[in-house]
Regions:
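N-terminal leader/targeting pre-sequences
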Residues: 25-95, 100-199
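C-terminal motif of bacterial Sec signal peptides marking the signal peptidase cleavage site
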Residues: 19-23
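Bacterial N-terminal signal peptides that target proteins for export
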Residues: 2-12
Length: 199
C-alpha cells in the first residue's frame, strides 16, 4: 500500500510539474500576441492621424486689387482633389495664372512664398506635359464678373505626406497675368496679386 501511494504521489507531482510548465509556456505566447496587437493598434492610430482635408483662403496682396477666393483640398485613395474658386472683378473676362509656391508666407505682397513649389527639380511647364513643377497649376479663365473656378485631381500631391508631395504650409499664389508655360522659371505670369496658405 505504501508503494502504491508513493507511485501515485510521484505521478501526481510529475503531472503537476508538466501542467505548470505548459501554463508558463502558454502565458509567454499570450504576452507575445498581446505585444503584437499593441504595436498594430499603435500603427493604426498613427495612420489615422494623417489629415485628409486642407484649405486656403485667398486674399489680395495689393490694396488696389480685390481678390477673394478659396482652394479646398481633399485626399481620397491616394489622390488629392483641389477645387479652386476665385473672384477678381478687375480681371473680368481675362485669365490669371495660379501656382503653388514653396512657403506658406504671404508677406511682402506674396514674395514671402518664394518660388514655385518644385520638389522634383523639373523645368516649368504646363500641368501634365513632359516637364512641369508640382506647383504649376495653370491658368483660370474668369467670366464677366471676374469669377472663375478650376478643379484638379492628382496623385502628385498629399496632405501631410512626405516632403516631395506634401502641400500643407505651401502658398496658393494668384498672378496678375497668364502663364505662357514656356518662360523659365515661372511662365512670365506677372505680379502676385493674391495669396493664401494651405492649412
Amino acid at each position: 500500500m505504501k508503494i502504491t501511494t508513493s507511485k501515485q504521489m510521484a505521478f501526481a507531482l510529475l503531472l503537476f510539474a508538466s501542467t505548470v510548465f505548459m501554463a508558463c509556456n502558454g502565458s509567454s505566447d499570450t504576452n507575445s500576441n498581446n505585444d503584437s496587437t499593441a504595436v498594430t493598434h499603435s500603427d493604426s492610430v498613427q495612420h489615422n492621424a494623417i489629415a485628409t482635408h486642407a484649405h486656403a483662403t485667398i486674399s489680395g496682396t495689393y490694396t488696389d486689387t480685390t481678390v477673394n477666393g478659396s482652394a479646398s483640398f481633399d485626399q481620397t485613395d491616394g489622390k488629392v482633389k483641389m477645387v479652386l474658386d476665385l473672384t477678381i472683378p478687375a480681371k473680368a473676362n481675362k485669365s490669371v495664372a495660379v501656382h503653388l509656391h514653396e512657403h506658406g508666407d504671404c508677406g511682402d505682397m506674396g514674395k514671402g512664398a518664394h518660388g514655385h513649389w518644385n520638389p522634383t527639380n523639373k523645368q516649368h511647364g504646363k500641368w501634365g506635359s513632359s516637364s512641369f513643377h508640382s506647383g504649376d497649376i495653370g491658368n483660370v479663365e474668369l467670366d464677366g464678373q471676374g469669377k472663375g473656378s478650376l478643379t484638379l485631381e492628382t496623385d502628385l500631391w498629399s496632405i501631410g505626406g512626405d516632403s516631395t508631395t506634401n502641400i500643407l504650409n505651401r502658398a496658393v499664389i494668384v498672378h496678375g497675368g497668364v502663364d505662357d508655360y514656356v518662360s523659365q522659371p515661372s511662365g512670365d505670369a506677372g505680379n502676385r496679386i493674391g495669396c493664401g496658405v494651405i492649412q
